[in-house]
């Protein structure tokens, strides 16, 4: 049971807390040694802090004294003075590891201590740490020089000096005085009191943090929170009214102290989206005191509220819900407004008028998850018995006496800062911010839209049509445009052609679709100003059709094409600020007439490694990650061991949607693992690297077929035996460009193609996979028949798609197995149409492109017959590195191959592979050695099975029973009975039965081919 107590901070306490006598004698605290303290939080997440507690008879009734060193972001003034307490049953867990950041001078002194136990003794004595009693928390600050940055496996627990490891990090850190006095550190942020930064709160503030507590019907939308030092400097008391003003606007607000501890930077004042919206364009304000005689506002008898142009306001199914939410906003408080005040209202778009028909009008009874915001603006007001009231002055809205009237829409735009801040404040789904320096396509589209806006001022009625195409689904085309619309303060309208219902057999698609468009836009565009209209999947209804094959469909497409172009030109004349954007799989799918109207076409590829790193970094931002768990809100944190660079590398080829799904799976997995220890994790869920890797593997396995995501094989150099001589050539070709790309920035062309040739079974494919694994490269394996297609031009298109996928997934290896079947000598093929010659030509063109835009893409070919390859493939810049992979021609190589193949075997201890291979012929390939080892394992298993039969028979004879083999396995046998140990005799017997796959005559032929190639190079 939680109780509320007065809170006293003490800088002299070390680790334990002290309670007053009445709490000590409370029934719930008797026979308990630990309690948890919950401080009111500005982010809505309760953070329980567990202390070992003791009695202090001198404390006043119902009070607790806690050490200041247990809170890392505690200011020196304006601290919280109340908290909640609850006794903790049981004993705290023992921490396995404590990571402490300490001042470099102390670190150097402790480094001189020869034993780890001596370092532990220092902390035990210096900071009064009691073994198995003192609770250590993340964020603890000891003395002037130590800060606990992480504890494992929990966020708090006791230290056991015989078990707990202490890890020290050498660092320059602030002294405890400065650490506890963030306001003094940032005092100069307010050197100009006429330009104080106005920022938005991250979350609504609970009433327990308001000092003094205001009336229940107080207008909470005008609260502004000030750091202690700024309140003191302005000589303002917490809870008083002040006026924020600048050259644009003036707003009456109520000032409150931003109590410590809190997570806000002390470089501004923090308010609600309502106040921030009034200073939308210039959030720098001056603060002026307001006296009581200035607060005698009249109550309006009638207020007219207009809708701010938004697509939700035009949809009838949301009107009742929006009005209910607006009514509830005014019923819950006595609002203070003025002409022009912008009012944000959140709604759940999953509700509609059909659902609301049977629901009470009190919207508070509806349990919903709001997901979007609509805005209103005060456009007029009337008073009884007052005729000449200042148009800019404030007034009260009393739900009992004020009549509310909603009118038509008005054209207002909000800055991206206000829009995004409001989304975060209300906990609504945000929009990913694409940084223009990392996503060039975003910068290009922004420049085009801005140029169009400037050109429209000089030459109006210029239509602007964009197309974003990608053959990869959910690559982020719509989210890119939505992000741009927010950044440029454009309205955004999203229309999906897949959601348009056409009647079966309808012959007039144009009329249906254009009617749908007009219904969406004609009531919206007059009130929105600059607007991006996105029509998704336009190639679903407007696709290129051969009129000779389907005359009826061709006529429909022609009609829709002409009507849509006329519609766009007409609306561009009426509404000059409109930008029409389309998405499609490829612009080539669209009719030529419509394509000619598209001013700019952008191909959106899956994000590259740098872009994926940016996406993952933002998705893992700890300030935005929260999870609802029952009635509680949990904070999601990322473990320090997470390597974003590794994740960005291994997520090659995945779309932003897939990456977001990976993070959500990892959070869910971490929550499952942590939900039994939430108290000791302080309601924090740490997402570790293992959870993210498991989620990544799951997404890859689930979606690789549909999205074509390449994967990284799990083959290491240890799996490759006898090929160490070729590693240097591979390192030169692949490792050098990856680690030192600057060496190739001066025009020096890098090698990107390697050709493995030699007898079959010598490890060409295995070596290619080992390269991909060793350098963390993605791996595409291409077979010749996969590229062939019966339609003219499609085979060459397949080659282009393979290379484009590789560029999207770089760093990547494209492996052409049996490349002689893909690129034989041109002119020698008897196929009709010369398809193989065209494939070779396309392959040559793509290989030549690797030296320009193919950084990070490497081509590996493997063939048994290099003499059949087109000679152009072997010229510099293509497959210019030829590596012969022959048989193991020394005993050392043969022994290395045997060790690699039996790495996961249990072999007899008396086996010496150097001696074992002494009788093997030099005609064995790697595949032959693999067959030999597999056969030896099979013989060992056969031998073990016979031994088990004998053991069962002996057991039955000795015990007079007749048990089955299954019963013997389940109840009698030991692990040693079932261990399959491969003995020397198994290898020798397998060798006797093995026939080499390559004859001596064939080996001589391959040696001759090698000699010919080496002489010609």
Curated annotation (Swiss-Prot):
Main localization of the protein described in the UniProt heading: cytoplasm
Annotated binding of ATP, by residue = 758-765
Q: Which GO terms describe its cellular component?
A: ATPase complex; cytosol; peroxisomal membrane; peroxisome; transporter complex
Q: EC number(s) per UniProt?
A: 3.6.4.-
The record's annotation in Gene3D superfamilies points to:
1.10.8.60, P-loop containing nucleotide triphosphate hydrolases (3.40.50.300)
Q: Which residues form the signal peptide?
A: none
Q: Where in the cell is it found?
A: Cytoplasm, Cytosol; Peroxisome membrane
Enzymatic reactions: ATP + H2O = ADP + phosphate + H(+)
GO biological process annotation, one example:
fatty acid metabolic process
> According to the UniProt record, what class of enzyme is this?
hydrolase
Keywords in alphabetical order, please: ATP-binding, Cytoplasm, Hydrolase, Membrane, Nucleotide-binding, Peroxisome, Peroxisome biogenesis
- Check the record and name the SUPFAM superfamilies matching this protein: P-loop containing nucleoside triphosphate hydrolases (SSF52540)
Q: Does the keyword Hydrolase apply?
A: yes
Claim: DNA damage is one of the keywords in the record? no
Listed InterPro entries: AAA+_ATPase, AAA_ATPase_domain, ATPase_AAA_core, ATPase_AAA_CS, P-loop_NTPase, PEX6_4th_dom, RecA-like_PEX6_r2
What does the UniProt function comment say about this protein?
Answer: Component of the PEX1-PEX6 AAA ATPase complex, a protein dislocase complex that mediates the ATP-dependent extraction of the PEX5 receptor from peroxisomal membranes, an essential step for PEX5 recycling. Specifically recognizes PEX5 monoubiquitinated at 'Cys-6', and pulls it out of the peroxisome lumen through the PEX2-PEX10-PEX12 retrotranslocation channel. Extraction by the PEX1-PEX6 AAA ATPase complex is accompanied by unfolding of the TPR repeats and release of bound cargo from PEX5.
Family to which the UniProt record says this protein belongs: Belongs to the AAA ATPase family.
Assembly information from the UniProt record: Interacts with PEX1; forming the PEX1-PEX6 AAA ATPase complex, which is composed of a heterohexamer formed by a trimer of PEX1-PEX6 dimers.
**Under which name does UniProt file this protein?**
Peroxisomal ATPase PEX6
Species of origin:
Candida glabrata (strain ATCC 2001 / BCRC 20586 / JCM 3761 / NBRC 0622 / NRRL Y-65 / CBS 138) (Yeast)
The gene for this chain is: PEX6
């Amino acid at each position: 049971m939680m109780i509320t107590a007065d809170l006293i901070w003490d800088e002299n306490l070390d680790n334990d807390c002290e309670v007053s006598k009445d709490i000590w004698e409370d029934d719930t605290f008797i026979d308990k040694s630990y309690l948890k303290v919950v401080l009111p939080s500005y982010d809505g997440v309760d953070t329980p802090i567990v202390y070992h507690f003791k009695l202090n008879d001198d404390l006043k009734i119902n009070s607790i004294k806690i050490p200041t060193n247990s809170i890392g972001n505690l200011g020196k003034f304006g601290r919280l003075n109340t908290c909640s307490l609850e006794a903790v049953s049981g004993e705290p867990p023992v921490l396995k590891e404590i990571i402490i950041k300490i001042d470099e001078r102390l670190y150097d002194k402790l480094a001189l201590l020869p034993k780890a136990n001596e370092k532990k003794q220092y902390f035990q004595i210096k900071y009064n740490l009691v073994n198995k009693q003192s609770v250590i928390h993340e964020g603890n600050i000891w003395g002037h020089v130590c800060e606990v940055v992480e504890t494992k496996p929990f966020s708090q627990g006791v230290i056991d000096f015989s078990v707990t490891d202490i890890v020290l990090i050498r660092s320059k850190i602030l002294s405890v005085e400065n650490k506890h006095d963030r306001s003094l550190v940032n005092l100069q942020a307010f050197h100009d009191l006429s330009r104080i930064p106005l920022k938005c709160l991250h979350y609504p503030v609970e009433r327990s943090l308001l000092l003094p507590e205001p009336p229940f019907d107080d207008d909470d939308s005008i609260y502004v929170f000030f750091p202690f030092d700024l309140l003191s400097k302005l000589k303002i008391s917490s809870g008083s009214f002040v006026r924020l003003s600048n050259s644009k606007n003036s707003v009456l607000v109520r000032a409150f102290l931003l109590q410590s501890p809190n997570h806000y930077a002390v470089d501004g004042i923090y308010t609600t989206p309502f106040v921030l919206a009034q200073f939308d364009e210039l959030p720098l304000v001056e603060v002026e005191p307001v006296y009581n005689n200035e607060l005698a506002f009249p109550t309006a008898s009638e207020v007219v509220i207009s809708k701010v142009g938004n697509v939700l306001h035009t949809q009838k199914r949301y009107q009742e819900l929006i009005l209910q939410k607006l009514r509830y906003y005014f019923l819950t408080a006595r609002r203070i407004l003025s002409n022009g005040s912008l009012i944000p209202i959140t709604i759940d778009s999953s509700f509609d008028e059909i659902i609301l028909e049977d629901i009470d009008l009190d919207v508070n009874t509806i349990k919903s998850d709001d997901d979007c915001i609509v805005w209103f603006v005060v456009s007029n007001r009337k008073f009884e018995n007052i005729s000449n009231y200042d148009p800019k002055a404030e007034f009260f809205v009393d739900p009992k006496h004020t009549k509310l009237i909603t009118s038509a829409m008005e054209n207002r735009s909000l800055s991206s800062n206000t829009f995004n801040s409001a989304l975060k404040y209300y906990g609504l789904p945000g929009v990913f911010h694409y940084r223009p320096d990392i996503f060039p396509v975003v910068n290009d589209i922004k420049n085009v839209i801005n140029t169009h806006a400037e050109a429209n001022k000089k030459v109006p009625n210029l239509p602007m049509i964009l197309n974003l195409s990608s053959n990869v689904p959910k690559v982020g085309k719509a989210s890119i445009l939505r992000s741009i619309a927010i950044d440029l303060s454009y309205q955004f309208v999203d229309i999906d052609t897949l959601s348009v219902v056409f009647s079966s057999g309808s012959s007039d698609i144009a009329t249906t679709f254009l009617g749908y468009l007009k219904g969406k836009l004609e009531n919206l565009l007059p009130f929105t100003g600059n607007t991006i209209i996105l029509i998704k999947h336009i190639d679903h209804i407007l696709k290129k059709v051969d009129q000779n094959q389907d005359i009826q469909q061709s006529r429909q497409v022609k009609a829709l094409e002409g009507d849509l172009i006329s519609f766009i030109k007409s609306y561009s004349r009426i509404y000059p600020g409109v930008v029409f954007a389309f998405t499609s799989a490829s612009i080539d799918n669209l009719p030529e007439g419509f394509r000619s109207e598209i001013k700019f076409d952008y191909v959106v590829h899956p994000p590259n490694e740098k872009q994926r790193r940016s996406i993952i970094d933002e998705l893992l931002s700890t300030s935005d990650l929260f999870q609802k768990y029952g009635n509680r809100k949990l904070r999601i944190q990322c473990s320090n061991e997470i390597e974003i660079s590794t994740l960005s590398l291994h997520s090659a080829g995945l779309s932003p949607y897939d990456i977001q799904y990976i993070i959500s799976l990892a959070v869910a997995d971490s929550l499952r693992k942590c939900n039994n220890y939430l108290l000791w994790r302080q309601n924090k869920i740490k997402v570790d690297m293992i959870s993210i890797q498991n989620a990544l593997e799951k997404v890859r396995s689930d979606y690789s077929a549909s999205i074509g995501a390449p994967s990284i094989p799990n083959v290491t150099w240890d799996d490759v035996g006898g090929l160490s001589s070729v590693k240097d050539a591979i390192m030169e070709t692949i490792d050098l460009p990856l680690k030192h790309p600057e060496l190739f920035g001066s025009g020096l062309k890098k090698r990107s193609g390697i050709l493995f040739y030699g007898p079959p079974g010598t490890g060409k494919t295995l070596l290619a996979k080992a390269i991909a694994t060793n350098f963390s490269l993605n791996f595409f394996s291409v077979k010749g028949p996969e590229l062939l297609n019966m339609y003219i031009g499609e085979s060459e298109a397949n080659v282009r798609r393979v290379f484009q996928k590789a560029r999207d997934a770089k760093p990547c290896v494209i492996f052409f197995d049996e490349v002689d079947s893909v690129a034989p000598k041109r002119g020698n093929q008897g196929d009709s149409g010369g398809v193989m010659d065209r494939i070779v030509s396309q392959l040559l063109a793509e290989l030549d492109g690797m030296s320009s835009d193919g950084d990070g893409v490497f081509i590996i070919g493997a063939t048994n017959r290099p003499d059949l390859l087109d000679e152009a493939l072997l010229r510099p810049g293509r497959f210019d590195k030829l590596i012969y992979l022959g048989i193991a021609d020394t005993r050392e190589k043969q022994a290395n191959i045997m060790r690699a193949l039996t790495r996961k075997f249990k072999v007899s201890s008396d086996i010496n592979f150097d001696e074992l291979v002494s009788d093997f012929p030099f005609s064995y390939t790697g595949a032959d050695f693999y067959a030999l080892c597999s056969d030896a394992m099979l013989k060992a298993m056969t031998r073990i099975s016979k031994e088990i039969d004998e053991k069962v028979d002996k057991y039955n004879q000795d015990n007079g029973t007749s048990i089955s083999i299954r019963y013997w396995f389940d109840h009698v046998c030991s692990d040693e009975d079932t261990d399959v140990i491969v003995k020397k005799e198994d290898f020798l017997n397998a060798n006797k039965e093995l026939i080499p796959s390559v004859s001596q005559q064939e080996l001589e032929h391959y040696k001759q081919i090698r000699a010919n190639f080496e002489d010609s190079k």
